[in-house]
């Protein structure tokens, strides 16, 4: 198609712009070099600079038609011309001789892609910026009816069918609607070969209302979604793409900006736009306007266009996620395409920016993100699509999509600040609650899904947090300890079994060991009991994991070494005691160095008592004698890492009831080996013992250092009575509910923490190491019902246990008489009553329910919470009164 200058210029909005030829429809190319101008808003937006009218030239017979007689030209093409014309060959044949005329030169210029389906032959011309527009190509044999629209498919360029494609409006020029589907507003009538109009009028249901008034091009268009009128189809297309999110065309790149019409901003939407936007979801398949959504999937499945050439069109009202077009996450080829098409990139980035940040839009993404670690849905089309298509159509699933997995992002370019992660990344997709750490979100999500991954190996109990499983395991330890026998020193070894410190069967020990190994994993994060403490405990745990040195006493190595050293135990006896004995030997070697560094080896009292202890242990070899009298001194001196006497009841399961002497300057190697031999020989009499967690090594050193300071202050302190041992204390308890905590510093343990009920008749009492159970007293009289039967938590007094038990039962016996407040502690009720008024202070009463409050801000909160609707009604009445 070519255009020539003629006598009188005519506005392009009065005539059609497109000449269809066989299987290719070319857009009209403007003649003048100075570009395009918009003279009036009622026009289509294009203005020809030349003074002559345009002509339509048939590519086969070279017959010229005035642009106003485009219908005659269409009939001419339908009845006489079939097959490809020379003008079409000039576009596709790169080896053809250069065109001789200026119009032919413009016609041969490569088209730019506008988001439509193309043939494989035209694929070479799509990605380079050009100066023309290549509209959609379709061929339908015979006239098209509305009922046939959903089943339409394009025909290849080599098809022998006679060309019947007709474009009668700018919507067809941009490939939005099927080319042979006429608009009712265009008044398309069948034209005979001589140029006379036919009798019938071709009509189709389309949401376009126009004023014909004898014009070929309608003067107004009305959007079916928001009922907004437009003066030209070009403005309507812009409105549909930029406002409603339809993906219709691509904006040209910077190389073609000189030929791009300067467009005005579309009129604003009406107030009913948002409410009517979901209308398109209910349009039938036969509605032509619905083809804006159906065109992509229809053409994509046709075999004539290859596989994966153009991904499917996204849903109508789903804007592309912003992070898909983040420059930091694009590959090199996609970044090059963004550089070539910045306007299209910016347009996609502008689509509905507020909808992206809405939490309601995040459910499907979060679910796909969670499921992406295990399974990935197959992509829509096989193979890797065109980079520009993947850039501008990020809705198609692909292995690189952030929707499907959460791999670490590639390193950011130097000097570029990384994009801030959205706040919703750690928000619950079920209730919207936000969390500072991912592990807290994982634990919280289980409350919605009902997942309970932590299961007890001894019963049917299952829970969602490792900490709850730990408390549950204490109940099993407590029960297992009550079945143990008596020890050789005459005291019951399990009469006061502490949770986690009593003798355990092999399977219970294995379960506890597995749990501890799981709990010590820093990648799991904290699992707090209350939601309010989740973030704080997470931060503390992270800091602890970062600052904690690597310990040689890992759980796996301890178990492995224990099994190797305990291989000589007969099958009828549990081997846990032998494993713990070998472990204690290694700990003695490692921690003995710590005690020497602390200065205890230089004290004469330390050396004398140690020598007497080793002498008696080597001479008698009696397990009972080892745990009596002065034998307790070395254990007491050693603190948390020395030779532990069998009577060390605050943590009897952490070390075996045999001496594990420490090396000192005055003691040689033979004595140490003798003690080891005695320990191994007496392992048959030892009950199973638990293992020390690796995180307690540092605390052991602290206690040893504090012990050295204490001995230097009072070097003549004797430890024949374990009841006066500075280490035999379990006074660590929190200020909230009296539950035992390991928060007391070592200095307090030494100076003021003496407890007469925390030791036993045997020496060597040592503080609890923070193992599976708190440091409870081990004597018979110390055994009280201060252990929670629900979670195994231990309390110093029964009143705290009573209050704690209500957190499990939900009981709230203390109720306020003025409101519906109820609590589990009387102190909380007393504190609450102060909010209703205090003696000698002014009282503020609610005007509606007459409830008293001592603080006015509390009254305001009460009004908003309980009388919000009433206040809103009063505000409306006050505003109406003020206006009147």
Swiss-Prot record:
The modification Phosphothreonine is found at residues 119, 260, 376, 406, 416, 744. Residues 509-521 have a biased composition (Basic and acidic residues). One of its GO terms (biological process) is alpha-beta T cell differentiation. One of its GO terms (cellular component) is SWI/SNF complex. Keywords: Acetylation, Isopeptide bond, Metal-binding, Methylation, Nucleus, Phosphoprotein, Repeat, Repressor, Transcription, Transcription regulation, Ubl conjugation, Zinc, Zinc-finger. Expressed in brain and thymus. Expressed in splenic CD4(+) T-lymphocytes. Signal peptide: none annotated. The modification Asymmetric dimethylarginine is found at residue 322. The keyword Transcription regulation applies. The modification Phosphoserine is found at residues 96, 109, 128, 256, 277, 358, 381, 398, 401, 482, 487, 495-496, 664, 755, 762. The modification Omega-N-methylarginine is found at residue 293. There is a cross-link at residues 136, 587, 676, 713, 877 (Glycyl lysine isopeptide (Lys-Gly) (interchain with G-Cter in SUMO2)). Pfam families: CCHC_BCL-11A, zf-C2H2, zf-C2H2_16. It is found in: Nucleus. Residues 396-422 have a biased composition (Pro residues). Residues 470-479 have a biased composition (Basic residues). The keyword Magnesium does not apply. Residues 727-742 have a biased composition (Polar residues). Sumoylated with SUMO1. The modification N6-acetyllysine is found at residue 841. A zinc finger (C2H2-type) spans 221-251, 426-453, 454-481, 786-813, 814-843, 844-874. GO terms for molecular function: DNA-binding transcription activator activity, RNA polymerase II-specific; RNA polymerase II cis-regulatory region sequence-specific DNA binding; sequence-specific DNA binding; zinc ion binding. Residues 743-765 have a biased composition (Low complexity). Interacts with TFCOUP1, SIRT1, ARP1 and EAR2. Interacts with EP300; the interaction is detected in activated T-lymphocytes, but not under resting conditions. Key regulator of both differentiation and survival of T-lymphocytes during thymocyte development in mammals. Essential in controlling the responsiveness of hematopoietic stem cells to chemotactic signals by modulating the expression of receptors CCR7 and CCR9, which direct the movement of progenitor cells from the bone marrow to the thymus. Is a regulator of IL2 promoter and enhances IL2 expression in activated CD4(+) T-lymphocytes. Tumor-suppressor protein involved in T-cell lymphomas. May function on the P53-signaling pathway. This is B-cell lymphoma/leukemia 11B. It comes from Mus musculus. The gene is Bcl11b.
